[in-house]
Amino acid sequence: MSQGTLYINRSPRNYASEALISYFKLDVKIVDLEQSSEFASLFPLKQAPAFLGPKGLKLTEALAIQFYLANQVADEKERARLLGSDVIEKSQILRWASLANSDVMSNIARPFLSFKGLIPYNKKDVDACFVKIDNLAAVFDARLRDYTFVATENISLGDLHAAGSWAFGLATILGPEWRAKHPHLMRWFNTVAASPIVKTPFAEVKLAEKALTYTPPKKQKAEKPKAEKSKAEKKKDEAKPADDAAPAKKPKHPLEALGKSTFVLDDWKRKYSNDDTRPVALPWFWEHYNPEEYSIWKVGYKYNDELTLTFMSNNLVGGFFNRLSASTKYMFGCLVVYGENNNNGIVGAVMVRGQDFAPAFDVAPDWESYEYTKLDPTKEEDKEFVNNMWAWDKPVVVNGEDKEIVDGKVLK
């Protein structure tokens, strides 16, 4: 009986899943998203990886899928090796896999996407990511100075997933000089990559000969001024029909057509970043906010019943915000994750230029996975909701029940 279908794209996040299926001969069909017609209807998020199992089981998020696949391994000793033999080992394996999935991968991804021109380049953000990468590498080095593997005495799912995350960086933005500074991490990485379990998917990983870096776009050469036309030529040009006139340039973003606002969004973003939120920043915001220029929306995730671990839900928010990068100059807001593992949700408040949410949000492919409700700050309950979403210091009220905020992201 088939054990399911795994929908993937080409990403190091999927190396461990592919390895488990191949090495342990699991009866799981691997489908490339580009070759699938049914994927979008099965998984509304349209994000890979995704797994369809027996009896309608649906899983998203790489870690959840890998833990499920590892549990399908028939050999009990192999299962214990991959997942841990007791609660301490299991917790350590989840700890290292989670650290790699959330922190290592995300901090590598932002510089990579910036250098490739896929998201706007921000030097401050990129530098902060490299500092975090070095700090994470130091944590791995400290463990691997005395141990062969990250979580237990044997290669585990923690190693498989973490090595996949580091592979992304080592093949792109982490060049020879960086690798030379981290011999323990590199010894571990090479050991895991050579393991029979992951040898096949890791065979395509080529360490970067030179680190990928940011290349500023080339400035276009200014056109030479044309020679002054004679009076006769000018008259001839004036006589041309209006159809020959050059068409007006369209705005790069629909919201650009609204022009500049009296409310300076960048001033608010700096205020929010630099001052205490509730006592200082929020009073400043309400004093300067112009509801004729901006509107505020309650944004809620439609598929909370599909969410599992809270850090995965937060990663989902981070990905959504990354895909909104084309609109961030017209937006500000927060989405928070409330609740606990296997019982959590995503909600928040986002301010956008204009009175319609769609032009700001529809730049993200998954924008329809969220529902949008316009808020009226003249109503005390709506204003307080915005305050709470942006301050993160009070529980979220869901169906009359208080739910603690466990994580969140700021869109700015």
Swiss-Prot record:
Listed GO cellular component terms? cytoplasm; cytoplasmic stress granule; eukaryotic translation elongation factor 1 complex; mitochondrion; nucleus; ribosome
Q: In which pathway does it act?
A: Protein biosynthesis; polypeptide chain elongation
Q: Where is the composition biased (Basic and acidic residues)?
A: 220-247
| Residues that bear N-acetylserine | 2
* Domain GST C-terminal: from-to ranges: 86-217
The Gene Ontology terms for molecular function here are: guanyl-nucleotide exchange factor activity; translation elongation factor activity
Question: What are the GO BP annotations of this UniProt entry?
Answer: translational elongation
Compartments where found: Cytoplasm
Which UniProt keywords are present, listed alphabetically?
Acetylation, Cytoplasm, Elongation factor, Protein biosynthesis
Q: Where is this region: Disordered?
A: 216-253
Domain GST N-terminal as annotated: residue spans: 2-77
Give the matching Pfam families.
EF1G, GST_C, GST_N
Quote the record's miscellaneous comment.
Present with 102130 molecules/cell in log phase SD medium.
Q: Which PANTHER family match?
A: ELONGATION FACTOR 1-GAMMA
Q: What does this protein do?
A: Subunit of the eukaryotic elongation factor 1 complex (eEF1). Probably plays a role in anchoring the complex to other cellular components.
Q: Subunit comment for this entry? A: The eukaryotic elongation factor 1 complex (eEF1) is probably a heterohexamer. Two trimeric complexes, each composed of eEF1A (TEF1 or TEF2), eEF1Balpha (EFB1) and eEF1Bgamma (CAM1 or TEF4), are probably dimerized via the eF1Bgamma subunits. The eEF1B subcomplex with the GEF activity is formed of eEF1Balpha and eEF1Bgamma. TEF4 interacts with EFB1.
For this entry, the protein name equals Elongation factor 1-gamma 2
Give the encoding gene's name: TEF4
